[in-house]
């Protein structure tokens, strides 16, 4: 159970980082 929780947290963190970096690239190309 603990391992599954770690995997879930890792996936959630990955999605947050991916979304953040993606929005950062979009903002950079927009000139903001």
UniProtKB/Swiss-Prot annotation:
InterPro entries named among the record's database cross-references: Cytochr_b6-f_cplx_su8_sf (IPR036143), Cytochrome_b6-f_cplx_su8 (IPR005497)
GO molecular function: electron transporter, transferring electrons within cytochrome b6/f complex of photosystem II activity
Gene Ontology CC: one annotated term: cytochrome b6f complex
Transmembrane segments: 6-26
Keywords: Chloroplast, Electron transport, Membrane, Photosynthesis, Plastid, Thylakoid, Transmembrane, Transmembrane helix, Transport
Family: Belongs to the PetN family.
Subunit structure: The 4 large subunits of the cytochrome b6-f complex are cytochrome b6, subunit IV (17 kDa polypeptide, PetD), cytochrome f and the Rieske protein, while the 4 small subunits are PetG, PetL, PetM and PetN. The complex functions as a dimer.
Protein name as catalogued: Cytochrome b6-f complex subunit 8
GO BP annotation list: cytochrome complex assembly; photosynthesis
Compartment list: Plastid, Chloroplast thylakoid membrane
Keyword Thylakoid: yes
Topological relation to the membrane, as annotated: Single-pass membrane protein
Main location class: plastid
Organism, as annotated: Pinus koraiensis (Korean pine)
Record's keyword annotation contains NADP: no
Function statement: Component of the cytochrome b6-f complex, which mediates electron transfer between photosystem II (PSII) and photosystem I (PSI), cyclic electron flow around PSI, and state transitions.
Matching HAMAP family: Cytb6_f_PetN
